[in-house]
Amino acid sequence: MQRPLIAVLIASAFLTLNAQAADLIQVYQQALANDATYASARSSLVAGEERIIQGRSGLLPNISASGSNLRNNSYNSGPDTVFGIVTDSRTKYHSNAYTISLAQPLYDWNAWQTYQQSKLVQANSEATFSQAQQDLILRVAQAYFDVLTAQDNLTSTQAQKVATTEQLASAKRNFEVGTQTITDTHEAQAAYDLVVAQEFAAINDLDNKRTALAVVIGKSAGELAPLRTGVTIEPPSPAAVDPWVSSAESQNFSVVAAGLNLEIAKREISRSRAGHMPTVNLVANKTHQYNTGVGQPGNTGNNTAVGVSWNIPLFSGFAVTSKVRENIALEDKARNDLEATKRQAAQIARQSFLGMTSGLAQVKALEAAEVSSKSSLDSNKLGYQVGVRINIDVLNAQKLLYSTQKDLSKARYDTIMNGLRLKSAAGSLREEDLQPINALLQH
C-alpha cells in the first residue's frame, strides 16, 4: 500500500511543479514590466512625442506681458524764474506701465523646417521603439531557451553520470572475479571523472543562464516550462529567402529609423540655409501707463501699435556657409549609414533563413541519430554482457547517445530562435508570434 501512495505523491508533486512553471508568454510579460532597457526605450518614445508640439510652437503667436512699478523721488534746487529767489522742490510719485505684446511669424524658413523636422524626429522615435519591442522579444526568448538548453545539458550529463557509475561498478566487479582486466576499470574511472567535471560545468552554466534571464525580467527566474518531446517546428513562410531579404531592406525598423535620420539630415541643411533668409513677423503691442504721487499730477497714457517687422541677415562671419557645408557632410554620413543598415538587415535575414532551414534538416537528422544511438547503446550493452563487446564500447555508445541528445535539444532551440530573428529582420516580429512557440511548451 505504501508504494502506490508514494508514487501518487511523487506524481502529484511533479504535476504541481509543472503547473507552477512559467511559460514563455508569462516570462515575456514579466520582462515588459521590469526590463530596464525596454523602459528606457519607452521613455524615449514619450520624450519624442513632445517634439512636434515644440516644433509647431515656432509657427504660432508669441504673446508676452511686461510691466514696471517704479517709485520716484526727485529733489531740485534753483532760483525762481520770476523773483530770482532760490527755492527747493521735492517730488515723490509712482510710475506704472504695462505692456502686452504679440508677434506672429509670417515668414520664417527656420521655424518651418524645424516643424517639419519635428515630425520626422517623432516618427524616428516610434521606429526606434518598435525595434526595442522586437529586441525585447528576442532577448526574452534567447534567455528563456538558454536556460532550457543549460537544463537539458545538465540533465543529460547527470544521466550520463548515472550510466557511467553503473558501468564503473560493473567493471570493478568483473575485475574482481577475473573476467576483465584492470584496463576496463581505468577506462570507466576516467569516463566517470570526466562526466563529474562536466556536471560541475553544467551546473555553473545553468546558474549563469538563470542570472542572465533574471536581468531581463527583473527578478530571479523560477521553474520554466520545457519544450515538449518530439515537437514539430513550422518552416518559414514564404519558403524562399528573397521575399524576406526584400522585406528586411524596406521594413526593418532599424532601416526605417536610418531612413528617417537621412530625411532629418536633409531638413537640417534647409534649416542652416535659413541663416541667409529674411524673417517677417506681424507685431502688435498695447501699453498703458499712469503716474500717481505727491507733487506729480496724475496722468494716464495708452499706446497701441500694430505693424510688420522684418530682419535680413547680411553677414555673420561665414558661420552660415560653414554650417551648411557641415550639414551636407552629415547628410552624406546618414545616407551611408542607411545603406550599411540595409545591408546588415539583409544579411541577418539571409543568415536567419538559412539557419532555420538548415536547422529543420539538422533536427530531423539528429532525431534519427538519437534512435540509432539508443539502439547502438542497447546492442553494446548486450554484447558486453555476452563478452563480444568491451567496456570502452559501452562507454563510447553512452557518450554518443547523450551528446546526440544535447545536440538535438540545442538544434531545436536554435531553429526556433532563427525563426524569430528572421521575422525581426523583416520587421514583422510581434508579440503574437510567441503564441505558437509557447504552444510547443509543456504546460
Whereabouts are the PLM-identified features?
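Transmembrane beta-barrel architecture of outer-membrane proteins
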Residues: Q26, S95-T99, Q142, E187, ...
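Gram-negative bacterial Sec-dependent N-terminal signal peptides
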Residues: M1-Q20
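A glycine-/polar-enriched beta->alpha junction
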Residues: Q29-A39, V46-P61, T99-Q117, A127-Q134, ...
